[in-house]
Amino acid sequence: MDWDLKMPVSWDLAELEHNAVPNMAAAASAAEPGIAAVAASRGAPGRPECSVDLKLGGLGEFGAADALKEPAAAAKAPVSSAAAAASVAKVPPSTSTLKRPRGGGGGGGGQCPSCAVDGCKADLSKHRDYHRRHKVCEPHSKTPVVVVSGREMRFCQQCSRFHLLGEFDEAKRSCRKRLDGHNRRRRKPQADSMSSGSFMTSQQGTRFASFTPPRPEPSWPGIIKSEETPYYSHHHHPHPVMTSRQPHFVGSPSSATTAAFSPKEGRRFPFLHEGDQISFGGGGGAAAAATLEISVCQTTVVAPPPPESSSSNKMFSSDGLTTATTTTTTAHHHHHHHQVLDSDCALSLLSSPANSSSVDVSRMVQPSPAAAAGAEHHHHHQIPMAQPLVPNLQQQFGGSSPWFASSPAAAAVAGGGFACPSMDSEQQQQQQLNAVLVPGSNENEMNYHGMFHVGGEGSSDGTSPSLPFSWQ
């Protein structure tokens, strides 16, 4: 079938609608009698019911629906036209308003505000927006005194208001209230900064003390003096006393030593009796057979036992944070055995006096009965412990050596002696004379002479007894 596109298409809607109703009703009745009955009942002219749902063959209701919709459309048309007219009328005012002055621009909408100062007729339209907004001209905003409503006032450039003259600061251009708030914001109260001086205090101390003040040390040079007099008689074997010049920490050997005794000079005991002297020579006698054990220390403490093959004694001590070297000088009958041992641990921390001079302080320690029984044995033993004992030297030697007599000066200067029990009673030496040397900063020695004797209270297996260490 050919379509002629050039022919104008004309549709008669009323005629189509009129012819479609009986045709659809006949088709519906032929197809289904129930649907035709429903359509006939709904399409009755006496019922003005408008159906909005989809129904098959409901073309006959379009006419009634359109008839009902036409009055509503006619009623809406005037309303929409009125709304369009109103919107068109509102557009010009909204587009015409470009910028309005804020905050009391004046009585009328288009009237420019004037200056609030009495008698000022300045046109603020030529001024900045700031002046128009606050109703003040630029000259009067900086004038110290103006009259506003019959009162002398001044314009505050900080809060942008007129204030009385009493509210203003003389040197500033702002009122005191504004200045106080400004200063409070800028000068906030800050916490007091803790200076280092509050922590690093002197010995008097303050609230804060970061470290304790040092202990007062005795002034040894003020108590004891030394004299360079040939008071020792040195014969053929010099006895070197080794002291440490520099601090030796735990496990470090002694690097530099100096000899305190030499055949050319001697030291004197000014606090002993005149004529009392000690001979370090090789001459015979009970005093010469005593073992001399000179240790560079201030306190003797517990030390681990050495092997059985060792023939020396160790004494461990500390000078501040240093470990001093130990010199053991053993004088047998007609023979002197010298041996220097470096201490390898420090069990106590004590500080020695600075600038200590070379002084000899006599100390007396009473030996145990086991020492006399094993005097003929020449084996050295470990000194495991130290206990203070202050006996009389006359009981030790039976008056054989007048030098060992106790004097009040020696008892006042020297502390308590130390009697050290040994490990084996059968292998004990003769009485030992120990000189405790305290190294000073001037390379001199302080000699505390006393009898340190190794007792026989130890066990035979070489272990040292565990005794408490006490100070007196």
Curated annotation (Swiss-Prot):
InterPro entries given in the database record: SBP-like, SBP_dom, SBP_sf
Tissue: Expressed in young panicles.
Gene: SPL18
Ranges of biased composition (kind: Polar residues): 192-209
Induction details: Negatively regulated by microRNAs miR156b and miR156h.
Sorted UniProt keywords: DNA-binding, Metal-binding, Nucleus, Transcription, Transcription regulation, Zinc, Zinc-finger
Role of this protein: Trans-acting factor that binds specifically to the consensus nucleotide sequence 5'-TNCGTACAA-3'. May be involved in panicle development.
Binding site for Zn(2+) 2: 156, 159, 163, 175
Chain positions recorded as Zn(2+) 1 binding sites: 115, 120, 137, 140
Region (Disordered): 89-110, 179-218, 233-261, 358-381
Gene3D superfamilies documented for this protein: Transcription factor, SBP-box domain
Keyword Transcription: yes
Domain-level remarks: The SBP-type zinc finger is required for the binding to DNA.
MF GO annotations: DNA binding; zinc ion binding
Classification via PANTHER family: SQUAMOSA PROMOTER-BINDING-LIKE PROTEIN 18 (PTHR31251:SF208), SQUAMOSA PROMOTER-BINDING-LIKE PROTEIN 4 (PTHR31251)
UniProt feature, compositional bias: Low complexity: 252-261
Top-level taxon in the UniProt lineage: Eukaryota
Motif (Bipartite nuclear localization signal): 172-188
ZnF (SBP-type) ranges: 112-189
Major place of residence: nucleus
GO cellular component entries: nucleus
This protein's name: Squamosa promoter-binding-like protein 18
